[in-house]
């Protein structure tokens, strides 16, 4: 299957490279197209663009965990627009599925609304694709990671930096889940969150609902006459047991099926509101 691989952290993210390698290892064709800059927190936005009538696209060589390289597209656009451009044939034959990530930071709880990673996947659903957003629970408490979003324990090459996130753990779970998603009905959307730990330390994979809050939150650290200073910190607010945020903190990988934007059935006082219209709603 031809699968779009994208993210919101940008084309040079090692999480993106690990995800692309996992898709190829699972026997699929990876079309790697990701933003040329960081679009974390972009949700499903389509801009702004420097030029509304032109998007920059550059072919780049991307490193993958086995030491080889693959070709990708560095795109001057947010991830949701990249999904749209892929469907329009901007990167060759349109794909049949999209996987986005591996995000540097969790995407849990109702805060998933703001995720560019998930925005790319939900946009793909509009074109009839199934998709999966993948995020690694990289610590953000020191303010060094965006959080919007291989070591010997998981069979990959030795990690040169002990602080390097365990991208291989998330990649292994992608290879496990992907065959099911390929066989699932069209427009099936999954949100996968993985602990930042060796695969052997992950307690298991659990289906989970969305927590009221996500794993990280924005705080204002300063106010002056010219603006606000912001930071992103780990969310220490209590969350209900069994939700994605709670299970992830407890060492479980979590997977949550998501619905795209849809209408709900609510009884509205239409007759009362229509009375103010010239025709009275007739």
PLM feature segments, named:
Residues 144-282:
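Electrostatically charged, flexible surface regions
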Residues 114-139:
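Short, acidic/small-residue loops that bind anionic groups at enzyme active sites
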Residues 9, 38, 78-79, 103-106, ...:
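Short glycine-rich anion-binding loops that position phosphate/pyrophosphate groups of nucleotides
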Residues 3-6, 13, 17-87, 93-94:
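A cross-family phosphate/adenosyl-ligand binding-site feature
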């Amino acid at each position: 299957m031809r699968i779009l691989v994208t993210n919101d952290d940008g084309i040079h993210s090692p999480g993106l490279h690990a995800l692309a390698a996992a898709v190829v290892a699972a026997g699929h064709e990876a079309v790697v197209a990701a933003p040329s800059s960081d679009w974390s927190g972009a949700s499903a936005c389509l801009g702004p663009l420097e030029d509304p009538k032109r998007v920059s696209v550059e072919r780049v060589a991307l490193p993958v965990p086995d030491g080889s390289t693959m070709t990708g597209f560095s795109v001057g656009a947010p991830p949701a627009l990249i999904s749209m451009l892929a469907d329009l044939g901007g990167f060759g034959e349109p794909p049949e599925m999209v996987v986005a990530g591996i995000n540097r930071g969790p995407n849990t709880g109702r805060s998933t609304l703001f995720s560019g990673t998930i925005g790319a996947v939900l946009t793909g659903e509009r074109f009839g694709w199934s998709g999966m957003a993948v995020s690694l629970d990289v610590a953000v408490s020191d303010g060094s990671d965006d959080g919007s979003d291989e070591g010997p324990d998981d069979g990959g090459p030795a990690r040169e930096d002990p602080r390097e996130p365990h991208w291989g753990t998330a990649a292994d779970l992608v290879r496990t889940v992907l065959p099911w998603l390929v066989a699932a009905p069209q427009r099936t959307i999954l949100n996968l969150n993985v602990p930042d730990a060796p695969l052997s330390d992950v307690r298991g994979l659990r289906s989970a609902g969305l927590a009221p809050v996500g794993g990280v939150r924005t705080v204002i650290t300063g106010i002056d006459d010219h603006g606000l200073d912001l930071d992103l910190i780990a969310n220490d607010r209590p969350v209900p047991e069994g939700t994605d945020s709670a299970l992830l903190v407890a060492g479980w990988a979590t997977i949550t099926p998501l619905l795209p934007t849809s209408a709900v059935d609510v009884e509205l006082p239409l007759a009362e509101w229509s009375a103010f219209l010239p025709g009275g709603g007739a």
